[in-house]
């Protein structure tokens, strides 16, 4: 699989021979969907909670007399039928959203995503993204020259300069290969990979 090797002006300077085992596999939509859903589910904190009628703090006094008012009878204001009352089936913080995906499936799904991005022209290669100083403007100008508005950068090493320069840029996500995830790969419009990162991706997914 040949990928575009971009220069600092964002122009295709040459072609780069990428390993077929990582960038030349068929796209498996069902598998990709499964690992994306599982990754998002496993990222949930699981802290959402609502109160039932027992937990809300309301008086237990009867709101009004049983008969003679013309209104529907009511026992207490904590009823789920009342505004501010407890939920009938509340969300509980102990709910478990974990979905298991084995390593073989996860690796195959990641390779399928990378291969599809390469086929669609959404994945490009650069020599490196080394910065002499942690200046956000310098990195922003580089991405602007490359016409990159929404980009995920996979660098072989995210040093302090690159981290500090990129953390305040909108729609820019910089990670090392081991932290690349399926949700981010699918989300960003363009994926920029350094040459060194390709070697590490090959080690991870071959």
From Swiss-Prot:
Keyword Magnesium found: no
Pfam family name, one: Ribosomal_L4
Keyword terms of this UniProt record: Ribonucleoprotein, Ribosomal protein, RNA-binding, rRNA-binding
GO molecular function terms attached to this record: rRNA binding; structural constituent of ribosome
Cellular component per GO, a single term: ribonucleoprotein complex
Any one GO biological process: translation
Region (Disordered): 46-78
UniProt key word rRNA-binding: yes
Annotated S-S bridges: none
InterPro entries (alphabetical): Ribosomal_uL4, Ribosomal_uL4-like, Ribosomal_uL4_dom_sf
SUPFAM superfamilies: Ribosomal protein L4
Family: Belongs to the universal ribosomal protein uL4 family.
Record-linked HAMAP family: Ribosomal_uL4_B
Role summary: One of the primary rRNA binding proteins, this protein initially binds near the 5'-end of the 23S rRNA. It is important during the early stages of 50S assembly. It makes multiple contacts with different domains of the 23S rRNA in the assembled 50S subunit and ribosome. Forms part of the polypeptide exit tunnel.
Subunit structure: Part of the 50S ribosomal subunit.
Name of protein: Large ribosomal subunit protein uL4
Gene: rplD
